[in-house]
């Protein structure tokens, strides 16, 4: 039995399969894959809206030019390190990037982007996400083999869509899958 072929999923979107992941944080989740190597994987759930925050208060922005709250939605990116915040955003903003995917998306995690968003000088599209999802070596591959996830190319329209509740259903439609007809008995051919 030889080594399995490794397919790097960085920059792809994972779509939780219906009827397999039936509860918890990953139920009907969409995860943007930040990094996927043989050493493990990291991603951000981008359809779990939990609240809205005032950027000025949250990041303790001290600037008298911002007099009103700057409310933005906050998303739960996964069960790991909820104290860490990330902006998943369009690549039109390129200051101090944490990651640049060359597919019109980037990730930042610094005070400067929050100030720029508060001043209206930030990226055209952005999501503020706390926490992330991580897999140990081989774990994601096992989950893919057991059909926990479908994989689709990154689609900015899904990521930045206004209604987070419809993102998962729209991803299934994009993949040509009707949830009602999706069998709970799936396997590999």
From Swiss-Prot:
Stored Pfam families: DUF179 (PF02622)
Origin: domain of life: Bacteria
GO cellular component terms, A-Z: cytosol
Stored InterPro entries: AlgH-like
SUPFAM superfamilies: VC0467-like
Protein family membership: Belongs to the UPF0301 (AlgH) family.
PANTHER family tied to this protein: UNCHARACTERIZED PROTEIN YQGE, UPF0301 PROTEIN YQGE
Xref: NCBIfam families: PRK00228.1-4
UniProt protein name: UPF0301 protein RAF_ORF0041
Gene source species: Rickettsia africae (strain ESF-5)
């Amino acid at each position: 039995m030889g080594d399995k072929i490794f397919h790097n999923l960085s920059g792809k979107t994972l779509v939780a399969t219906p009827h397999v992941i039936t509860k918890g944080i990953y139920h009907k989740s969409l995860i943007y894959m930040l990094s996927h190597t043989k050493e493990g994987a990291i991603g951000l759930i981008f359809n779990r809206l939990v609240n809205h925050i005032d950027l000025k208060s949250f990041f303790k922005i001290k600037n008298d030019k911002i007099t009103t709250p700057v409310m933005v939605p906050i998303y739960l990116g996964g069960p790991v390190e909820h104290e860490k915040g990330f902006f998943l955003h369009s690549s039109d903003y390129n200051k101090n990037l944490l990651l640049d995917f060359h597919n019109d998306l980037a990730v930042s995690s610094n005070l400067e982007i929050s100030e720029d968003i508060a001043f209206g000088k930030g990226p055209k599209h952005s999501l503020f996400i706390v926490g992330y999802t991580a897999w140990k070596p081989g774990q994601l591959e096992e989950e893919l083999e057991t059909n926990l996830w479908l994989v689709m190319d990154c689609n900015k329209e899904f990521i930045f869509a206004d209604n987070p509740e419809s993102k998962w259903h729209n991803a299934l439609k994009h993949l040509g899958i009707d949830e009602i007809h999706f069998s709970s008995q799936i396997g590999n051919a």
